Amino acid sequence: MLKALLGDPNARKIKKFQPLVTEINLLEEDIKNLSDEELRSKTSEFKERLDKARNYDEREEILEEILPEAFAIVREAGIRVLGMRHFDVQLLGGMVLHKGQIAEMKTGEGKTLVATLPAYLNGLTGKGVHVVTVNDYLARRDAEWMGQVHRFLGLSVGLIQAGMSPEERKKNYACDITYTTNSELGFDYLRDNMATVMGEVVQRPFNYCVIDEVDSILIDEARTPLIISGPIDRPTEKYILAAEIAKQLVRQKVEDGPGDYEVNEKDRNVLMTDEGFKRAEELLGVTDLYDQENPWAHYISNAIRAKELQKKDVNYIVRSGEIVIVDEFTGRVLPGRRWGDGLHQAVEAKEGVEIQQETQTLATITYQNFFLLYPKLSGMTGTAKTEETELEKVYNLQVTIIPTNRVSRRQDLADVVYKNEQAKWNAVAEECQQMHEQGRPVLVGTTSVEKSEVLSLLLQGRNIPHNLLNARPENVERESEIVAQAGRAGAVTIATNMAGRGTDIILGGNSDYMARLKIREYLMPKLVMPEDDNLAFSLPSLGERNRPQGFAPGKKKKNWRASAEIFPTELPKEVENALKEAVKFAVDTHGTQSLPELEVEEKIAIAAEKAPTDDPVIQKLREVYKLIRKSYEDYTGKEHDEVVERGGLHVIGTERHESRRIDNQLRGRAGRQGDPGSTHFFLSLEDNLLRIFGGDRVAGLMDAFRVEEDMPIESGMLTRSLEGAQRKVETFYYDARKQVFEYDEVMNNQRRAIYAERRRVLEGMDLKEQVLQYAEKTMDEIVMAYVNPELPAEEWDLEKLISKSQEFVYLLADITAKDVEEMSVNDIKMFLHEEVRKAYEIKERQVDSIRAGLMRDAERYFILQQIDMLWREHLQAMEALRESIGLRGYGQKDPLIEYKQEGYEMFLEMMIDIRRNVVYSLFQFQPQGQPQAVASEQ
């Protein structure tokens, strides 16, 4: 109703940008006539104008003025370098990003190209632009591919990848535009704040950031803290015993019924009952699980969580004797990530694999707080509108929906609901068969590894050839290959949460990727050095058509052959000969089996892109790549038209996800760029969402209507109640994230203060004066501890005051209580200030006699050492406070306010401890070679 009265607010936003689009289009002809050199010289012109800006606001003003011309220049550079012209809607996207907003653009609308516009414009300031993607592969692809536009226009482009040295990182962060991943960026920030000398710091101050797949990073990952940790010793046998005991404890079926513990799936939490505590204590032979000397409660609670809430092949998989977490949103494995607080060890004990050491947090930050460090932040995604409130409240980011370049022809069918899971899976298999027989490609999204394998077995039973894409290592290897062929006529692909974001499904098959695979097949065995590799790549022969294709461990020799049915045709003889020639040239240049696998992969990737190269091997491969692609295109082109005629890609959802956004991402795979397509969701009352949030009502309805087991119901009311359930879940998770954010905000303010202090020390401001102030404050605190101005002077404990001062500063050994007897409180303070300064001068001369400037180094070293050590302890104390603070709610107190107050007091105490410890350490410092006479003074 409001929309009808006031008009669509999104349309109003877009309308505001329209005059700028017109202006850019009017500039197009003039800019087309410029030579490459003239185009490049525009960059220097813009930079000169920006150099005149005196502050951030003036800089932003100039950027607004040059935006139309800068965008027109990027558009022209895109045509010259990439052969791609920015559509008008992509220009709109670029403006939204430059404004520090989120641009919602549908899958296949060229988000990657859009990012070049604001990246170039903001890169002109020389302050650095970070373009953030979700994985290393996409960061590298974009830096090589889109980076050409920026390099052509004279801006420097950097790339940050896992495993890079600090020197390389520093060089790449110093570029005008840097492509990286969210985790590399966050961990570099934390490492920079643990650096001991300025030379170790790799990042510059933050300026502007564009996040690709912004919803996945700012919402799905928001509660995941980035943690740098160090090991601590905990006895592993406790985890093993706790796992044994958890097996014997029984879950409570109904509230207040018999049982040792209750499980709250909604909160993902477990609570032990009184019987449970008694039973666990009996089994362990202890009197109290919370005994300070021998605590067990934490271990038992984690063991129950591992048993009930962490499910194998859903939340994690076991790979080579390790527990590897599976991302619940993308279905990808997250190697190297571990659950904290002993939970990972509990899962290791449950599965009987080796238990790894528990760790202690050295530095941590959540993505929420990390990205708020940027003065200007923006992002792109296909799905953000459903989370608009959160993005605006937490990050102050507005969402603007960018219209599609071509009208969508996708058809979303109504959901169907079955009484039980078995009936649902049979119906899904039936629909796969129908589509397969019609020659339409099908993509089935499942929510876990386990479920994808259930469906795979059903399809095998019906003799339907299909590909399986889930977190299992054998399938991950072929992820891009499987997704690239998912658009072939009659192809059936089962994917866990559509893991392969970033790879488009092209109707009729992806001839680019087929050509890459063919080159790989010929080049890899000849050029890659042999590895003693157990996880070998072995693909089934044609005889095993109906088995899900994957990867078989145990073969020593890698097999680079892709399954033959991937290629639509045999290569013509002359093309095959050209390929053999190119391979021979590569071997002659580099030597047989002489390069690491990744290097050869990279050569093939660059050959298939348009990036300029002076490597003769890549040039040769590029020529042959074009020939192979052309041979395949003749077939995939025909197949594309056939698939379009039959209705395009059919997407099947097998469960509503907790978030509507993830469902929309799956739907968005069909009907890209104006292609036809359809989507259909199959659900059952046993699905998690319905079970946890409101399935009873629907079950009651079905019973009332006497619905058969395998009879689906399809109704608008049902779809609405499902969306209601999803909204409930979204609100529930939003509240959880908001709570994390509010609590983390307390930590964040402290983190900013401590990191700013640390950076000041690192940059070597006058540390001597700082240490002297520390010493004076410490003396003041000692005076106040032993002297009460309210009491008469004869009751002051001057003996203790002096001995305490000497404990901190041994060079005050000559002072006695008599020296301060007649003084007022203030005079005592002033006297001690003076004595401490004198003592410090003596200390400095002693230390510097060993090596000139040694005292300055010692000051820096001790301040940093104390900050790091006490901050580490403070993080643990704050974590413990946060865990226990919830109980204050029972005493009618607001836990958050209590947490803020106590956290602040603990922070102040930590700062006092840092001061005192630095003073003590510096005066105690005895560098080697110090004259003996001094040592004897102690």
Curated annotation (Swiss-Prot):
It is a peripheral membrane protein. GO terms for biological process: intracellular protein transmembrane transport; protein import; protein targeting; protein transport by the Sec complex. It is found in: Cell inner membrane; Cellular thylakoid membrane; Cytoplasm. Its EC number is 7.4.2.8. ATP binds at Q90, G108, E109, G110, K111, T112, D504. Part of the Sec protein translocase complex. Interacts with the SecYEG preprotein conducting channel. Has a central role in coupling the hydrolysis of ATP to the transfer of proteins into and across the cell membrane, serving as an ATP-driven molecular motor driving the stepwise translocation of polypeptide chains across the membrane. Belongs to the SecA family. This is Protein translocase subunit SecA. It comes from Microcystis aeruginosa (strain NIES-843 / IAM M-2473). The lineage of its organism: Bacteria, Bacillati, Cyanobacteriota, Cyanophyceae, Oscillatoriophycideae. The gene is secA.
